[in-house]
Regions:
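Divalent-metal-activated hydrolytic enzyme cores
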Residues: 232-233
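Conserved alpha/beta-domain cores
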Residues: 2-221, 227-229, 241-243
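Nucleotide-sugar donor-binding patch of glycosyltransferase catalytic domains
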Residues: 247
Length: 248
């Protein structure tokens, strides 16, 4: 049996989170930059872990499985958490995601932008009919492939050449806010070189909207490289939560 001893999960998460925060602080100091925002990716882990993390000061949670994320967000609605959807998103799932997500980090095609815009409009109508507060505009991070040969890969993402057009589509869609860019460093490439490419893409996006300064980059294995490159958001899972539980 793996994981923390019985009754020791809060201590285990506290220790792991402190180690990650220390790495982020050291990397930021080395880069002479402000610390990026930590998004803890809780895919496959229970809502009870998220509640513990919230008690430890975590305010941003990332998920990439829509049904799992929706269930956790509903169970934890008493907490002030910002939910970030970071997985590849089918257009027909947009309506469910905008019910709980503050942002989507995987916007990679015009058809998805259209679907998200319609979903936000429908969600605003639903909330108005229920007498609820309107939701804020949905923050959209444009995901790009950083494959060295300039092609798309299995991790999703638009091609860099499509940056301006995709950014203009988001900027022109009511209910959406162009927040910045996102990418996953290719497994067969230097993260430093990959994130340098992402910064060049970010410049193209900021040419459309100068306020789109977000750079969502860096995971457990390459957060130092991401911080050095100027990431504003880090998506960290296993180094905070430990090995993924077995999934049946």
């Amino acid at each position: 049996m793996s994981g923390a001893p019985e009754g020791g999960r809060p201590e285990d998460l506290s220790r792991r989170l402190a180690q990650v925060r220390s790495r982020i602080s050291a990397a930021s100091h080395a880069a002479s930059s402000s610390e990026p925002r930590l998004i803890v990716v809780t895919k496959y882990f229970p809502a009870s872990d998220v509640r513990i993390l919230a008690g430890l000061g975590v305010s941003d949670v990332g998920e990439n499985r829509g049904q799992e994320a929706a269930a956790k967000a509903a169970e934890l609605e008493d907490l002030s958490l910002a939910w970030h959807f970071i997985g590849q998103l089918q257009s027909n799932k947009a309506r469910s995601v905008v019910r709980y997500a503050r942002s989507v980090h995987s916007v990679d095609r015009v058809s998805l932008v259209t679907a998200l815009g319609k979903a936000v409009a429908a969600e605003q109508e639903r909330r108005a009919g229920a007498g609820s507060e309107p939701r804020p505009d949905l923050d959209c991070y444009l995901q790009f492939s950083l494959h060295p040969d300039g092609t798309a890969d299995g991790r999703g993402g638009a091609l860099p050449a499509d940056a301006a057009g995709l950014a203009e589509k988001v900027a022109g869609t009511a209910g959406l806010r162009l927040a910045g860019v996102m990418a996953v460093a290719p497994v067969d490439a230097s993260p430093d070189e990959a994130f340098a490419r992402l910064l060049m893409i970010s410049a193209s996006v900021r040419a459309v909207d100068p306020s789109a300064t977000g750079v969502s980059a860096g995971m457990s294995g390459d957060l130092e490289a991401a911080v050095a490159a100027g990431a504003t958001h880090l998506r960290i899972g296993s180094d905070v939560l430990g090995p993924r539980p077995a999934v049946g």
